[in-house]
Amino acid sequence: EIIMGNAIKKLGWRRDTFIVSSKVYWGGEKPTQRGLSHKHILDACHAAMKRLQVDYLDLYFCHRPDPETPIEETVRAMHTLVNQGKICYWGTSEWTSEQIIKAFEIAETLNLTPPTMEQPQYNLLERFKMEKDYLPVFDKYQLGTTIWSPLGSGILSGKYIDTNPSDTRTSLKGYEFIKKKYESDSYIGVHNK
């Protein structure tokens, strides 16, 4: 975000010519620096705006559901940011359909701003959640979507078919899960089809 903010400033782009988004969940080690509490959502939004050098975010995602924070608190925090003009729209990422429905019900009951989008993982290897679980929710609430990992962390690009290139994420510490995934029977089965 710092690099992007510097680039936007250097290029002199007018604010009405681009859209920026950010996510909230991860942060520091202290309890007030992570999750979806009201405090962390507001603090993280302000920090993202500072890094991006903008006065507001167009899209702001709850990067993961937070089992330690009531959904109502999260919805209220996002509504606060919308009312303050600091975000235009808010959404979720990797929430269950039940959690999304609950957020909508809370927003409707309390006259708060509901989420407008979900960001699920969606690719040939990860289809069920989007195609079976989310579609009825998206249809009912007219929810938009952006997806993440359309190439399955690079697995579907074909570069891992016969080898594990040393200059890719699969060889990096912390990304072993990608290597396990492309060596799995389910991946091999999809690839062979």
Label each PLM-derived region with a short phrase:
Residues 27-33:
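A short acidic, helix-capping loop that chelates divalent metal ions and anchors anionic groups
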Residues 1-19, 55, 83, 165:
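N-terminal binding-site loop/beta-alpha segment at the start of enzyme catalytic domains
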Residues 1-13, 44-50, 134-142:
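Short amphipathic alpha-helices and their capping/turn segments at secondary-structure boundaries
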Residues 65, 69-193:
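Beta/alpha (TIM)-barrel catalytic core signal, keyed to glycine-rich beta->alpha loops juxtaposed to Asp/Glu
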Residues 34-53, 71-76, 100-105:
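Short, acidic/polar
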Residues 14-18, 22, 55-59, 88-89, ...:
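Short acidic capping loops at alpha-helix termini that bridge into adjacent secondary structure
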Residues 23-25, 150-151:
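Active-site-proximal beta-strand/loop segments in catalytic clefts of secreted hydrolases
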Residues 1-10, 62-72:
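Glycine-rich, proline-tolerant flexible connector loops at the mouths of alpha/beta enzymes
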